[in-house]
């Protein structure tokens, strides 16, 4: 059986999805000869496959187009494991991500050895369905196979799987402490099939970024998505009015994003046409944004400065940068205003907020008492989650707290902001919207204040409910279920053939008394004996069963996962 391992691209696909560093993701090869029996249907289906692969190789921005073509081929043959695998991968990129599960399970059931990362991908698909216990099982199975078979080129997946396992455990806790907030995508024409994010409410107008475009519009070389454009919309009586694209003087081939008001005339913008990406000041002249000077006290030559927020007082500015010396990929920094014309040097906000992973964006409340940011660290339940912390009396920011479910999801949740009427906005890549990132909004819930007799009622600041990261009672049942579901079985394979073997031929190979199990996988009839809980036990029986070329195979739930060549350290 010929197998093509396409590991590296898939790993980095899910690590770097939002960083713009993706290159060369590859799919599994779908053979024309084995695709379908009918000649005319075979040609048509394979034409869809070839076109899908060609588009996919351009960049992840074309993944939705590739997915549609793969699905057209799937209608002509729904049992090809490589095709089902490729459809699953495209769903994990283009969404809805939970739709990937059935295709990946189908691929794995037909060919358990379809790909070295199949259980990692199945784990992701379960995770996006909020089925965290089954996701953990498959992430652990992925680790087990890497360790068992000593796949050196896949060692990078071990810490990534551990990270996903921890996120799934966080997710179970957060789901168990979910709030009653009902979230809906913002109404009107704001959201589209493309990415919409970074909602900023200035005066009476909602500004937001979108990567929508027409087929012939220019695309970013990083990911082959359309460049970010700035739009605005005014709210009518019952819904948002038609959107309007904001013009600027930087040209078309640039990402352009508005963040915060700097002073009475100028606003803080991000532009990708300077270095790795810098923050600029700009002001509106008639119907066009005129880009001014780069913010020199923030920008560095070799780093990317993105996301900025300024409280109403104007005496601080918070921003995100990937400059050297931080705790992780991107950290949150701040500068203080020292005079009308001078700002302090950037200071890292510290290790209680920044993590070894990635902080993506930042927002400070108008009164400067609350900080919101997205992070892949802390107790995130998947990708970026949104966190908040309060400024203490001594001016230091308190411990970050996860905003909880349903504000956060198992997908990426980013770019939180608030307006002056007590409504919060954020962008999420979760399913249920129009596609990609969609913008959601909801009224900030009023705090519940209990009446205390004979004592004054204290005014509590308006906050969004937060969720504690600890809840032992919720974790107990899923943990037991997790232990049950991750049960592995080792067997000894004594023979394999393309055709069903005669009993006498099997007896000539194996003369012992163990029951022989017959399994048909990917065109091969495989014969195994024994059920052992550890590799050591199985290997001992393999060496004593009398079949010289016997070997140990790992099973889970009746499925053959692959060869087991050496003991797993956990045993």
Identify the role of each PLM range.
Residues 27-47, 86, 93, 114, ...:
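Short, conserved micro-motifs composed of acidic
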Residues 38-76, 492:
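Alpha-helical segment of the N-proximal tetratricopeptide repeat
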Residues 61-63, 97, 132:
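TPR-repeat structural position
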Residues 73, 106-108, 142:
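Canonical positions in the second alpha-helix
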Residues 76, 110-111, 145:
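Structural marker of alpha-solenoid helical repeat scaffolds
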Residues 485-487, 498-571:
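Extracytoplasmic
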């Amino acid at each position: 059986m010929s197998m093509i391992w396409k590991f590296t691209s898939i790993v980095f696909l899910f690590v770097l999805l939002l960083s713009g560093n993706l290159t060369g993701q590859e799919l599994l090869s779908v053979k024309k000869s084995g695709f379908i029996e009918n000649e005319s249907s075979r040609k048509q289906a394979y034409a869809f496959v070839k076109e899908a692969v060609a588009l996919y190789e351009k960049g992840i921005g074309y993944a939705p187009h590739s997915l549609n073509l793969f699905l057209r081929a799937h209608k002509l043959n729904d049992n090809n494991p490589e095709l089902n695998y490729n459809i699953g991968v495209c769903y994990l990129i283009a969404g809805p991500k939970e739709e990937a599960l059935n295709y990946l399970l189908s691929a794995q059931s037909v060919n358990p050895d379809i790909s070295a990362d199949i259980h990692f991908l199945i784990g992701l698909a379960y995770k996006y369905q909020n089925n965290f216990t089954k996701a953990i099982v498959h992430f652990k199975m992925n680790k087990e196979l890497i360790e068992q078979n000593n796949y050196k080129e896949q060692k990078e997946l071990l810490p990534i799987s551990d990270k996903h396992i921890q996120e799934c455990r966080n997710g179970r806790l957060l789901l168990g402490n979910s709030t009653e907030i009902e979230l809906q995508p913002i109404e009107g024409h704001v959201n589209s099939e493309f990415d919409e994010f970074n909602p900023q409410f200035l005066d009476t107008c909602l500004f937001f970024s979108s990567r929508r475009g027409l087929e012939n519009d220019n695309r970013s070389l990083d990911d082959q998505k359309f460049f970010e454009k700035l739009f605005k919309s005014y709210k009518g009586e019952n819904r948002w009015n038609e959107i309007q694209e904001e013009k600027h003087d930087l040209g078309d081939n640039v990402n352009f994003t508005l963040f915060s008001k700097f002073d009475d005339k100028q606003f803080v913008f991000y532009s990708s046409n300077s270095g790795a990406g810098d923050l600029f000041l700009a002001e509106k002249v008639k119907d066009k944004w005129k880009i001014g000077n780069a913010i020199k006290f923030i920008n560095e030559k070799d780093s990317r400065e993105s996301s900025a927020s300024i409280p109403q007082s104007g005496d601080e500015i918070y921003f995100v940068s990937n400059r050297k010396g931080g705790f992780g990929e991107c950290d949150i920094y701040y500068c203080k205003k020292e005079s009308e014309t001078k700002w302090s040097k950037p200071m890292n906000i510290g290790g209680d907020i920044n993590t070894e992973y990635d902080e993506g964006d930042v927002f400070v409340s108008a009164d400067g008492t609350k900080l919101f940011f997205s992070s892949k660290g802390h107790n995130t339940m998947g990708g970026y989650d949104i966190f908040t912390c309060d400024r203490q009396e001594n001016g230091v920011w308190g411990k970050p707290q996860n905003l909880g479910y349903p504000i956060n999801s198992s997908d990426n949740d980013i770019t939180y902001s608030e307006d002056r009427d007590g409504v919060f906005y954020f962008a999420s890549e979760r399913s249920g919207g129009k596609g990609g990132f969609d913008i959601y909004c909801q009224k900030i819930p009023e705090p519940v204040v209990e009446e205390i007799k004979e004592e004054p009622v204290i005014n509590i600041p308006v906050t969004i409910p937060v969720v504690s990261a600890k809840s032992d009672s919720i974790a107990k049942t899923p943990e037991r279920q997790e232990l049950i579901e991750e049960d592995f079985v080792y067997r000894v394979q004594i023979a394999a053939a393309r055709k069903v073997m005669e009993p006498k031929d099997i007896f000539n190979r194996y003369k012992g008394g163990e029951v022989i199990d017959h399994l048909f996988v990917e065109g091969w009839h495989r014969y195994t004996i024994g059920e052992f809980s550890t590799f050591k036990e199985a290997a001992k029986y393999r060496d004593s069963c009398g079949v010289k070329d016997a070997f140990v195979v790992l099973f889970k739930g009746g499925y053959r996962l692959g060869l087991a060549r050496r003991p797993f350290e956990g045993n």
